[in-house]
């Protein structure tokens, strides 16, 4: 198959960029994969032929909108030259709507993946909500990374939807003493790092680690007790998780919570707020605990610090995380492509039997 991925991609950073990067690596084992992303960027040498970009100015509030319309035009242009079988847009809103706008001119289905912050953030903006609803209702298939997002997408107009979770690349464990209670994530309000700092004050004899950057960092550093260490953003979390005995995820909302699977893969138990995708990933008392109040959080931390249950949870977590390999997730996504293409072929055959193939030719051709 020839596949076009639309969305953030390295050197861009963040969850979506990491996801598309790993998905592309997996799909390229069997298929020709191209990427259309935000520019200007300097693609890696080995993939310059396959990475296309839309250069958009850094204008706050307008960059995403400009990308939408310019990326739609670029997609149509690329399709005429390359003839993709599938267009797969990541992040519902400005990115996905680029594919939807181009869809009438394309000879390929458009698939959209909802990652979490897209439905939460974009749907709160008037124009963003329009982009989201159109993308969900007009796409050939919506992929949600959790059942929580699936329900939300259906409530906003998605009709054809499938749950395929995020995945993780293999993380190498380093030989290190597990001595830290760790937070990994952006230092933004919805990740609620303030609760983590508050927790550190309750356990003055424990070592706490904050991994990530964001607008709240300066204020957090001022308020943090001496037992908290700030490391900033780290691309590779393997070394950090190898030193971690407990991961805390206090996010106020979360579409999936990839860091939970990453921690589990190295045998680290997780305590996370009982919201969104976090509730789906943490199996109570098996690979961690969930909490609703700060008092519950303190209680769960005390339980894991005071007995050997954390060691047992770590072993169970490793087993659970093995279900989220990129080989498996990549296969499920590839399977979705084939299902959508198969349905289009079926529709084409129906039109042919009714003698209407010619008038429906543009929507039936599969290259």
Per-segment meaning from a language model:
Residues 1-41, 201, 326, 364-367:
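N-terminal subdomain of nucleotide-sugar transferases
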Residues 48, 60-86, 94-101, 105, ...:
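An amphipathic, basic-hydrophobic alpha-helix
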Residues 260, 269-272:
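Short hydrophobic beta-strand element within catalytic cores of glycosyltransferases
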Residues 112, 122, 129-172:
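Donor nucleotide-sugar binding/catalytic pocket of nucleotide-sugar-dependent glycosyltransferases
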Residues 309-323:
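A short, well-ordered alpha-helix in the C-terminal region of glycosyltransferases
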Residues 4, 174-203, 208-211:
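Conserved donor-binding/catalytic core segment of Leloir-type glycosyltransferases
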Residues 284-285, 289-295, 303-308:
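Conserved acidic donor-binding segment of nucleotide-sugar-dependent glycosyltransferases
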Residues 233, 252:
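Aromatic "clamp/platform" in nucleotide-sugar-dependent glycosyltransferases that forms part
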């Amino acid at each position: 198959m020839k596949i076009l991925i639309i969305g953030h991609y390295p050197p861009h950073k963040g969850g979506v960029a990491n996801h598309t990067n790993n998905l592309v690596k997996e799909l390229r084992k069997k298929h020709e994969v191209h990427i259309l992303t935000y520019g200007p960027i300097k693609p890696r040498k080995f993939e310059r032929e396959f990475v296309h970009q839309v250069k958009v100015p850094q204008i706050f509030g307008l960059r995403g909108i400009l990308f939408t319309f310019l990326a739609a035009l670029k997609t149509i242009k690329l399709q005429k030259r390359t003839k993709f079988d599938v267009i797969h847009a990541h992040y519902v809103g400005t990115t996905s709507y680029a594919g939807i706008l181009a869809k009438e001119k394309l000879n390929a289905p458009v698939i959209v993946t909802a990652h979490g912050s897209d439905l939460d953030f974009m749907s709160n903006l008037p124009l963003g909500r329009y982009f989201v609803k159109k993308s969900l209702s007009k796409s050939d298939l919506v992929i949600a990374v959790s059942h929580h997002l699936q329900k939300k997408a259906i409530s906003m107009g998605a009709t054809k939807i499938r749950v395929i979770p995020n995945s993780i690349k293999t993380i190498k464990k380093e030989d290190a003493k597990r001595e830290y209670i760790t937070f990994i994530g952006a230092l933004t309000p919805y990740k609620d790092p303030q609760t983590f700092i508050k927790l550190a004050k309750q356990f003055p004899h424990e070592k706490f680690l904050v991994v990530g950057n964001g607008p709240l960092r300066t204020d957090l550093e001022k308020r943090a007790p001496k037992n908290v260490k700030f490391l900033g953003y780290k691309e590779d979390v393997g070394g950090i998780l190898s030193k971690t005995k407990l991961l805390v995820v206090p996010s106020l909302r979360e579409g999936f919570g990839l860091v939970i699977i990453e921690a589990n893969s190295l045998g680290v138990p997780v305590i996370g707020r009982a919201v969104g995708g976090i509730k789906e990933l943490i199996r109570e008392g098996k690979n961690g605990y969930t909490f609703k109040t700060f008092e519950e959080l303190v209680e769960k931390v005390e339980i894991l610090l005071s007995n050997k249950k954390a060691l047992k949870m770590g072993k169970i977590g490793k087993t659970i995380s093995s279900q989220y390999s990129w080989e498996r997730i990549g296969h499920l996504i590839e399977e979705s492509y084939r299902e959508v293409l198969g349905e289009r072929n079926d529709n084409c055959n129906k039109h042919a039997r009714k003698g209407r193939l010619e008038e429906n030719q543009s929507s039936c051709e599969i290259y």
